[in-house]
A protein has these predicted regions:
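Short, basic, low-complexity termini and linkers enriched in Ser/Thr/Gly/Pro
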Residues: 1-5, 12-24
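Residue-level detector of intrinsically disordered, flexible termini
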Residues: 3-9, 99, 242
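Class I (Rossmann-like) S-adenosyl-L-methionine-dependent methyltransferase catalytic domain
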Residues: 17, 22-136, 154-161, 172-243
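A conserved beta-strand element that flanks and buttresses the S-adenosyl-L-methionine
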Residues: 146
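Short catalytic micro-motifs in class I SAM-dependent methyltransferases
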Residues: 149-153
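Class I S-adenosylmethionine-dependent transferase superfamily signal
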Residues: 166
Length: 243
């Protein structure tokens, strides 16, 4: 996204604050180039859903609606909290948070196609094109920064960079829903290698920020679909110790 476009957004929202290190080239990893191209467009077309369809997908896959899963972690979070989703695609997670009465919702998405398509699925949510490796916001600007099935697509060697940015931009909470395994494990993805991993992402945050974060809550969600039985996803909530 061009700096003048970001400046225009800043004029339209008192909550949008630029971070001085914004990069011009968003495709700075192999995975980013992959997701910004045709594969990412195809993913967006396959996975774009309206809210009811999205909740039905979660019920079929994990036995719970996404709104119920979110509420189990965020029920006590003030509804005026500023929330940023990194890698929001067309904004389904943000739309779910909006349904739960959160009002200050922001998303950063690498793929321009998904950002444009988000207009079909969301209203009143600020979604911009950008990279999770260089979030264009001031330190501690958000009350909560989250991912939903995004860290699983970041190469393990690059995870520290995106985690640094998430923690930098969060005043208090880091929240995630990701593919889980006790140890980092590569998984083939639609015939491609090097684009999907499962790991203990909450522990990776804790290891990277020793003494700075604490685990508030974590819950494992086993898949109930026959084709996915034995696999787990995890939702976790971390808090800055100094917050």
């Amino acid at each position: 996204m061009k700096r003048e476009e970001l400046a225009g957004l800043a004029q339209n929202s008192s909550f949008f604050i630029l971070h001085s290190s914004l990069k011009k080239d968003l495709k700075n990893t192999q995975q980013e180039a992959f997701w910004a191209g045709d594969f990412g467009r195809e993913y967006t077309d396959r996975n774009s859903r309206h809210l009811d369809e999205w909740n039905d997908f979660y019920r079929r896959t994990w036995g719970h609606s996404k709104l119920d899963m979110n509420a189990a972690f965020l029920a006590d979070l003030p509804r005026e909290s500023r929330i940023l989703e990194v890698g929001c695609n067309t904004g389904m997670q943000l739309r779910g948070l909006q349904e739960a009465s959160f009002i200050h919702l922001y998303g950063v998405e690498l793929q321009s196609y998904a950002v444009e398509k988000a207009k079909q699925y969301t209203q009143g949510i600020n979604i911009i094109q950008g990279s999770g490796f260089d979030l264009p916001f001031k330190d501690g600007f958000f009350d909560l920064v989250c991912t939903n099935g995004v860290l699983i697509h970041i190469a393990p060697a690059d995870l520290p960079r995106i985690m640094d940015e998430m923690v930098r931009c969060s005043h208090r909470y880091i929240w995630g829903f990701e593919y889980h395994a006790p140890a980092t494990t590569a998984v083939p993805y639609r015939g491609n290698e090097g684009f999907l991993w499962k790991a203990d992402y909450a522990q990776l945050f804790l290891d990277q920020f020793p003494g700075q974060l604490r685990l508030v809550k974590q819950e494992l969600y086993p898949y109930i679909l026959d084709a996915e039985r034995g696999n787990l996803d995890v939702m976790y909530l971390l808090e800055k110790v100094s917050a």
